[in-house]
Curated annotation (Swiss-Prot):
Mn(2+) 1 binds at D397, H401, H456. It comes from Synechococcus sp. (strain JA-3-3Ab). This is 2,3-bisphosphoglycerate-independent phosphoglycerate mutase. The gene is gpmI. The lineage of its organism: Bacteria, Bacillati, Cyanobacteriota, Cyanophyceae, Synechococcales. It catalyses: (2R)-2-phosphoglycerate = (2R)-3-phosphoglycerate. InterPro entries: Alkaline_phosphatase_core_sf, BPG-indep_PGM_N, Metalloenzyme, PGAM_B_sf, Pgm_bpd_ind.
Length: 530
């Protein structure tokens, strides 16, 4: 195919832009978004389910960016790690896992200790507190001392939920008769993913440098921070009790989502680590709940699921070029997660990374790097060499997580303006744009009591098809509607149909494009008397 003849299909992911009709706390409705409003009124559109069983999560579990992008790229419902791990604990199979049996035996013989590091949260996005409870039960049954290094959430949960969660954890430890919460650290420090190494360093040092601790309960310490208006996400690394990670110990990082667990893991295990000066702990067994990065020298409890015939793979095997573009905060999502947990690009897949602004929180700069992402995408689209472009706008989600309503409105308005520019560029080359979101967030900024809601939601997400003049979808006659009842798993098959590529049997989602004959039938006059 001549490069000049390519009319691209562009998938635009509005991260965290959910759909909700109630106006209270709804930044999406409060924002001036003439582009999206016009598209919704003019072009084929529908709502998609992006949470719970529709994306491989437990019923009622809110969606998230990792799961959303994985489902979009896989074109099928993929059982998520949250479910896999919970099932292993519930059935007891986790306790017979050969890796854990061997580590328990060695620690028992050599007098080593367990350290459980992870996000102590019921959010279910990066971890789940029930998984920690399962690991603590394992340690107690084996008679091995256990130290919990609790990372506090406040981003996928309410900002001050941590005290309640940690109080419940302390009761669980009392019931088990073993284990102690040794350290606290807000995810702002322990789960940075933007190479702000000074944050990671503070978390690492509290984990590896011992001290007497403050001798107070975790819940009491959390309440003191709340009194200073420091919420869960921003809890400074704090030692509660002696129990630093030492030589001969074993660490289990129980986060199942990789992106925000990598930097801290690298500090523990990489011999050539250069993020900051650190003391490397020798003879340390380091286990991650899932595979964070295939290059990390760690042991993995739950190996990756082998997904075949993903959207990017099908496009690549058809000999077509594709582009993935996002700013730092969502770059892993349009690459690693969209490709089913594969870091390596497919042949013909190019990637553009735009640096996210270096600010403490994104409400300080709601525009983030959306303009730069748009500029680079427009340049790439104008070259007419990419059959598929996958682009993410991070603003609605990342600013929505701050709980700042006015800033989130600005973020949405920024994305709307950028989307208008992007669409004009796609139209210029006769391309087609499919606009979706991966989960809800910005449409719910406070709860029924008026408290800030910084987590995701279970709300459906919009999906809009903007068909290019020079691209007529095969078999659709250029007159297309989008069916209702769809999920994120249906987006991949939809894109393949627009591209004119066959859908592999592994993709069990169904195209959202309604059959042309159904559309025609719908326009027939109703019989008299009905």
């Amino acid at each position: 195919m001549d490069a000049q003849s390519v009319a691209p299909v562009v998938l635009v992911i509005l991260d965290g832009w959910g759909y909700r009709e109630a106006p209270e706390g709804n930044a999406v409705l409060a924002a001036r978004t003439p582009v999206v409003d016009s598209l919704w009124a003019t072009y084929p559109h529908t709502l998609l389910q992006a949470s719970g069983r529709a994306v491989g999560l437990p019923s009622g579990q809110m969606g998230n960016s990792e799961v959303g992008h994985l489902t979009l790229g896989a074109g099928r419902v993929v059982p998520q790690e949250l479910v896999r791990i919970s099932d292993a604990i519930e059935t007891g199979s986790l306790f017979h896992e050969p890796l854990l049996v061997e580590v328990c035996h060695r620690l028992k013989e050599q007098g080593g200790r367990f350290h459980f590091i992870g996000l102590c949260s019921e959010g279910g996005v990066h971890s789940h507190i029930d998984h920690l409870y399962g690991l603590l039960k394992l340690a107690a049954q084996a008679g091995i001392p256990a130290y919990v290094h609790a990372i506090t959430d406040g981003r996928d949960t309410l900002p001050r939920d941590g005290a309640r969660v940690l109080a419940a954890l302390e009761k669980e430890l009392q019931w088990l008769g073993s284990g102690v919460i040794a350290t606290l650290s807000g995810r702002y420090y322990a789960m940075d993913r933007d190479r702000r190494w000074e944050r990671t360093q503070k978390a690492y040092e509290i984990l590896t440098e011992d001290g007497p601790g403050c001798g107070r309960s975790a819940a009491e310490v959390m309440e003191d921070f709340y009194a200073q208006d420091i919420t869960d996400e921003f809890i400074p690394p704090t030692r509660l009790a002696p129990g630093a990670v030492q030589s001969g110990d074993a660490v289990i990082f129980f986060n199942f989502r990789p992106d925000r667990a990598r930097q801290l893991t690298q500090a523990f295990v990489c011999p050539d680590f250069s993020g900051f000066q650190r003391r490397l702990i020798p003879d340390l067994t380091f286990i991650t709940m899932t595979q964070y990065d295939p290059t990390l020298p760690v042991q993995v409890l739950f190996k990756p699921q082998n997904l075949d015939h993903l959207l990017g793979q099908v496009v690549s095997e058809a000999g077509l070029k594709q582009l993935r573009i996002a700013e730092t905060e969502k770059y892993a999502h349009v690459t690693y997660f969209f490709n089913g947990g594969i870091e390596q690009p497919f042949p013909g897949e190019d990637r553009i990374l735009v640096q996210s602004p270096l600010v403490a929180t994104y409400d300080q700069m709601p525009e983030m790097s959306a303009v730069e992402v748009t500029d680079k995408a427009i340049e790439a689209i104008a070259r007419r060499e990419y059959s598929l472009v996958v682009l993410n706008y991070a603003n609605p989600d990342m600013v929505g997580h701050t709980g700042n309503f006015k800033a989130t409105v600005r973020a949405l308005e920024t994305v709307d303006r950028c989307l208008g520019r992007l669409l004009a560029a796609v139209v210029d080359v006769g391309g087609t744009t499919l606009i979706v979101a991966d989960h809800g967030n910005a449409e719910l900024m406070w709860d029924e009591q008026g408290n800030p809601w910084t987590a995701h939601t279970n709300n459906p997400v919009p999906c809009i098809l903007v068909e290019g003049e020079r691209r007529k979808i095969p078999g659709r006659g250029g007159d297309v509607k989008l069916r209702s009842g769809g999920t994120l798993a249906d987006v991949g098959p939809t894109l393949l149909e627009i591209l004119g590529l066959p859908q592999p049997p592994e993709m069990t989602g169904q195209s959202l494009l309604q059959p042309a004959e159904y559309t025609i039938l719908q326009r027939q006059p109703a019989p008299v008397g009905r």
